[in-house]
Curated annotation (Swiss-Prot):
Gene coding for it: nhr-268
Protein name, as recorded: Nuclear hormone receptor family member nhr-268
Domain NR LBD: 98-337
Species this chain originates from: Caenorhabditis elegans
Cited PROSITE patterns: NR_LBD, NUCLEAR_REC_DBD_1, NUCLEAR_REC_DBD_2
CDD domains on file: NR_DBD_HNF4A
Length: 340
């Protein structure tokens, strides 16, 4: 099924209409924040996911035209039966809102700064953001750096991160940023009916130097850009499942033996919370098939690891064969950790 607003892939009826996650959240924000928009053109702008709808006035009008109707600010993903249900529902809604805000920053801004991973973790404002315009250069270097930054910012907003030691925090982010980016691109590609990972505006995830290195043998590139999205298509992963999987992956205390005892306890306790929430979601959506669904979802991690490792290896090979080619410092930090 496709979203009746922007034609992206859709799985649920939101506010009475089959719509995608992005349009659902756009409509929700507009209504509940009483936002007003004006069309700069002739009130007939094209609203399509491939062009990343820019006219909010026409987008909202289309939402109304196709029959979207707001219920109340207490509109929930699942029915509320008790306090446990309330906490579960609040968790899902908070994650959806947080992710939506993060994705908006990713596609709406860019930066010319070149800080290291450590610099950003210590003070993310060092990455001075500039709003994109139609004239903004949209190359793979810019998008990959911004994707990594957006993933770092997303996780930094969780309170438990502030409790971690600096060295443990750096290790945790070095391991997870590329994997989180891979999952994010897979979810976007899946939502937009794309067969492989791409950046917005269909910008390739590989620099031209990688194609030059591979020549006519692009099987590895096709595997890296296609295998994760293939798994998403196979499992028909929902937005809520993706968001919980992301946190289950991030809170993995076993990625190194060097974490402090305190960090291991914090990560393990939070991973248990997100694992429990994911299993509960499976129970609500799939009933008796919940254990099978839960196991299938966790199998995504193995494929993500393989894709990230292949990407890191290719990046290393590019730099070996073309010493003049340099990734930004943030990407160098991430790739060097994957290969260490």
């Amino acid at each position: 099924m496709n979203c009746l607003v922007c034609s992206a892939r859709a799985f649920n009826r939101n506010y009475g209409v089959m719509s995608c996650f992005a349009c659902k959240m756009f409509f929700r924000r507009t209504v509940f924040k009483n936002m007003l928009f004006n069309c700069k053109y002739f009130k007939n702008c094209t609203i399509h996911y491939k062009t990343h709808p820019k006219c909010r006035a026409c987008r909202f009008q289309k939402c109304l035209n196709i029959g979207m109707k707001a219920a109340s600010k207490n509109d929930r993903i699942v029915s509320i039966g008790n306090y446990e249900d309330y906490n579960f529902d609040k968790l899902l809604n908070d994650l959806i809102v947080k992710n939506d805000k993060n994705y908006s920053n990713f596609i709406d801004f860019y930066s010319l700064e070149d800080p290291s991973l450590k610099d950003i973790i210590e003070d993310r404002s060092i990455m001075k953001l500039v709003r994109r315009t139609p004239e903004t250069l949209n190359d793979v270097d810019q998008w990959s750096n911004m994707l990594a930054y957006s993933r770092i910012s997303y996780f930094l907003d969780f309170n438990f991160i502030r409790e971690l030691d600096s060295s443990d925090k750096n290790t945790l982010f070095k391991y997870n940023v590329s994997r989180a980016g891979c999952l994010a691109l897979a979810m976007c590609a899946y939502s937009e009916n794309k067969p492989k990972l791409t950046f917005p505006n269909d910008v390739d995830i590989f620099p031209s130097e990688m194609y030059n290195l591979c020549g006519s043998s692009t099987a590895v590139l096709n595997q890296v850009s296609g295998q994760v999205i293939a798994k998403f298509i196979e499992l028909e992963i929902r937005q809520e499942e993706y968001l919980l999987l992301l946190l289950v992956m991030f809170c993995n205390a076993s990625i190194t033996n060097n974490f402090s005892h305190k960090t291991k306890l914090i990560l393990s306790s939070h991973q248990q919370v997100y694992c429990s929430a994911l299993f509960r979601y499976c129970q609500l959506k799939y009933s008796k098939s919940a254990p099978t669904r839960f196991t299938e979802l966790l199998s995504v991690f193995g494929i993500v690891n393989k894709s990230v490792n292949n990407m890191s290896f290719l990046s290393m090979m590019v730099q070996c064969y073309n010493p003049k080619f340099n990734f930004k410092r943030l990407m160098q930090d991430i790739f060097s950790h994957t290969l260490s």
